Amino acid sequence: MKIQFRPMLWPSIFSIVTFIILCSFGTWQLKRLYWKEALIQRYITESQSNPISNPSEFSKSKINEFKAVEIFGKFLHINEIYITGKTYEGNAGFHVVTPFKMENNKIVLINRGWVSEGYKDPNKRKFSLAEGQVKLKGIIRYPQQKGYFVPENDGENGFWFTIIPNQIFKFIKTNSNFVIKDYYIDALRLGEKITLPIGVDGKPNLRNQHLSY
């Protein structure tokens, strides 16, 4: 007796659809992998290049993200804010973001780095409040994009989740004629000694796990 194979309709359709979805997901993962690898390489190239000394002369369209900078000016500590939900070596804390007035009177936001909950209050870390003119080395960063599940910034209640210069300057009521909204600067940690706030180490901290699923 000859048995004729007759595939069931709905299981077959489900299998085909699943196959198409998996192929599409794999293609998307590869594209993300190539994009992330290019981003990491760009970070290395720009951050290790000769620093520019007056980034305020450039708009976002004329200055590359991750470009190394070296600027002079003074911190406006009275207007610092705190980005919540940040960790350092598994410890919860905040990133301290402080306006920085450069020699040409332009004001740019500096992400000075991480502090623990116990040092969020500037009165408990007066040693970190540099006074007068200082030299700062850092890396240009474009305004952050709010993630889908990330709450909106709420400056009135002291909750900041995303570094968006336009929002921050508006909240601290800084003269819009002097502020830089196109980017902010990640401060680099200097030397081997770790001091608060803990700035970036100049290495690409960009997770690349798009082939590990």
Indicate residue ranges for each PLM-predicted region.
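Surface-exposed, charge/polar-rich loops and edge strands
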Residues: 1-57, 67-213
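Juxtamembrane extramembrane loops of integral membrane proteins
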Residues: 58-62
